[in-house]
Design a protein with these regions (language model features):
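A surface-exposed beta-strand-loop module
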Residues: 81-141, 195-197, 202, 523-535
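Hydrophobic helix-coil surface modules that form long, contiguous segments used
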Residues: 61, 149-152, 160-320, 349
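Beta-strand-rich binding/interaction modules
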Residues: 85-92, 455-456, 469-542
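N-terminal, polar/Ser/Thr-rich
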Residues: 28-60, 139-144, 155, 164, ...
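Acidic/His/Gly-enriched intrinsically disordered linker/tail segments
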Residues: 206, 313-314, 344-412, 416, ...
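Glycine/proline-rich low-complexity spacer/linker segments in large multi-domain proteins
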Residues: 34, 38-39, 115, 124-171, ...
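Surface-exposed beta-strand/loop patches in extracellular or lumenal glycoproteins
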Residues: 60-83, 162, 168-177, 441, ...
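Amphipathic alpha-helical substructures
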Residues: 266-268, 399-489
Length: 557
């Protein structure tokens, strides 16, 4: 997902631009809660929604939740639900008692359910949700309705278990004005007229997805099918104002689908719809139905361009980022909010890999340099771990730790393990957790299996610890003559906190001779004695940019 500042954290453009702009929402909606799937889990949501003609509210809605019980003697089911008016609740076809509390709908079962029991809960309701489903005019000044759920706002318009670990399949039946086009997760099953003024659209997503990715989008726009041959049906849903430019603006999409399909695994969903809609984010990775901000295609004057696609680099980045999420974030979803980097860090890095392939190595280096600067600046404000279990406002997790630093962690792992082991490990990880959830330790296990390396210390320092190394080099020449001699290199880490134990590549240039060594720190000070040729030596730390680090002023003794 890409966000813009007003809530979702930092605007990030240029080659590493990750965020787009948000509108402030109330802190309560962003409050952290790690709901445990302990007594029951949702299996499927069947959501039927009838919108009024002006697309300003829900006239009627019916959500049926298929439930599986996981514990003995369960007498109540607690659904996350906002402030919409509840008309009735039933369990397996029988009226049921329910109670409202802030953000909850508690349903009392007629008899205690036991582990393994399966039943359905139906909630009938109506009204205008205060969040989650955005009613707004689009770029053509026409009414629209768009789901926009991250992190935990889908319950404002769909009663559900609103946590990323509670994945389920979903179907949508949307009754909308006949003038409008509707898109939702999954495959379009039917589209039928209901009288002269209404059309009923039915979609079904057969793969379990996180609740924040369950979406509908309704507006009086255009549907355009991509002209390229793609691994899955690819289409664009845009206001008429964007109709001419959309094929060019979305031109990276077909290549991104092919690249990620080859690099990770086959595309996981039945289609891919790219939608220009009313979202608070620069892009929101809803499974098979990505929504992009209405300003995605706006000109911003003299900005960096993609060499391959001839569009702004920020547009290329956000399109690739959101498509990468279809694998990482949507198919493999973070188990807890502390594991968010498994979604955002992955999407950030894979967007960078896409840039590396299609715009070249220098563009990729630029991307990583910009990402590193964002990390350093962020740490001056908040020096917290990537795996953050403390921050209570979920919007504050949309930060450089989970995006750029997460991407850098993956890059360092790639360079440490080598491409073959790194990508094999990611494929092992993806295969094991596709259509499910994963933790940081699941990723470590997969990479260790692929590489044969023990990555405990790396993950402990980079994921569960904070900060980054700041290196300083001092050198002392010994017995140096025309025929050469020895150079003693002392590598110090000057950052606060514990040492980083990553191997550090060093390049030494002495006269016409270049030599590379690797220093393997065991603490904050490491020393290496190196034979060198004649001439005054110069030293470069990490010449290929494989480490997230800063350099303190070097000195000679």
């Amino acid at each position: 997902m890409k966000s813009k500042i007003r809530i979702r954290a930092i605007a990030f453009r240029a080659a590493c631009g990750l965020f787009a702009a948000l509108v402030f929402i109330t802190p309560a909606l962003a409050q952290r809660r790690e709901r445990l799937i302990d007594t029951w889990k949702p299996v499927h949501y069947d959501v039927a929604i009838s919108l009024n003609d002006q697309l300003t509210e829900i006239d009627m809605a019916r959500t049926e939740i298929s439930v599986e019980v996981l514990a003995p003697n369960v007498s109540k089911i607690g659904l996350d639900f906002g402030e919409m008016t509840v008309d009735s609740v039933s369990v397996s076809g029988q009226p049921a008692r329910f109670e409202r509390s802030p953000e909850m709908l508690n349903v009392t079962l007629a008899r205690a359910a036991q582990a393994g029991d399966k039943f359905s809960i139906v909630v009938n309701y109506h009204g205008r949700p205060k969040d989650g489903l955005i009613f707004a005019n689009d770029r053509d000044s026409k009414p629209s309705a768009t789901g926009d759920n991250w992190p935990n706002r889908v319950h404002q318009w769909i009663p559900c278990f609103d946590h990323p670990s509670a994945k389920a399949t979903v179907s949508f039946t949307v009754t909308a004005p006949a003038r409008d086009v509707v898109v939702a997760n999954g495959k379009l099953l039917t589209m039928t007229r209901n009288g002269a003024d209404l059309t009923v659209w039915r979609f079904e997503e057969t793969k379990p997805i996180p609740p924040y990715c369950m979406v509908i989008a309704v507006n009086e726009g255009a549907k355009l099918d991509a002209s390229e041959k793609t691994v899955t049906p690819l289409s664009y849903y845009v206001p008429q104002k964007d109709r001419a430019y959309a094929p060019k603006g979305f031109s990276p999409a077909a290549s991104a689908l092919a690249f990620f399909n080859e690099t990770i695994a086959p595309y996981p969903y039945e289609k891919l719809a790219l939608i220009i809609g009313a979202t608070r984010f620069g892009g929101m990775e809803n499974s098979s139905a990505i929504v992009f901000t209405s300003t995605l295609f706006d000109s911003r004057g003299n900005e960096k361009m993609s060499k391959r696609f001839g569009i702004p680099a920020r547009t290329e980045d956000v399109v690739a980022h959101e498509i990468a999420h279809q694998w990482f974030g949507d198919s493999v979803t973070e188990s807890t909010w502390a594991d968010l980097w498994l979604s955002e860090g992955f999407a950030t890095y894979f967007a960078g890999l896409f840039i590396e392939k299609y715009d070249g190595e220098e563009a990729f280096r630029d991307y990583l340099r910009n990402a590193a600067e964002r990390c350093f600046n962020y740490e001056k404000q908040r020096n917290t771990p990537i795996h953050d279990t403390e921050t209570q406002d979920l919007m504050r997790l949309l930060n450089e730790n989970n995006y750029q630093k997460g991407a850098w962690v993956l890059h360092m792992l790639r360079k440490r393990l080598g491409d073959e082991a790194f990508f094999r490990g990611l494929r092992i990880y993806y295969k094991a957790h596709a259509e499910a959830n994963a933790t940081t330790e699941d990723l470590r296990d997969a990479l260790e299996k692929a590489s044969g390396q023990n990555l405990h210390d790396f993950f402990t320092r980079w994921i569960y610890g904070s900060g980054h190394p700041i290196y300083e080099v001092s050198s002392a020449s010994m017995e140096l003559g025309r025929a050469g001699g020895f150079l003693t290199i002392t590598l110090k880490q000057t950052q606060s906190g514990d040492a980083f134990l990553d191997p550090v590549p060093i390049e030494i240039t002495s006269g016409s001779e270049k030599k590379r060594i690797v220093i393997r720190p065991e603490g904050k000070i490491a020393t290496e004695r190196v034979r060198i040729g004649g001439g005054h030596p110069s030293i470069e730390i990490d010449p290929d940019g494989t480490l997230l680090k800063e350099l303190a002023a070097s000195r000679k003794s």
